[in-house]
Amino acid sequence: MGLWISFGTPPSYTYLLIMNHKLLLINNNNLTEVHTYFNININIDKMYIH
């Protein structure tokens, strides 16, 4: 979860992302969906920086 801070995302956005990650882990045991969810957000963050 430290990756989000290194990407330079706003603290509030990082907090919401971490909370969403915890909710996904609690409500959904499908690790593939969680992995896909984070890949999509990482790609968005990379486009935001570039």
From Swiss-Prot:
**Protein name in UniProt:** Putative uncharacterized protein Q0143, mitochondrial
- Subcellular locations according to the entry: Mitochondrion
Taxonomically, what lineage is the organism? Eukaryota, Fungi, Dikarya, Ascomycota, Saccharomycotina
Supply the alphabetized keyword list: Mitochondrion
Recorded GO cellular component terms are:
mitochondrion
On whether Mitochondrion is a keyword of this UniProt record, the answer is yes
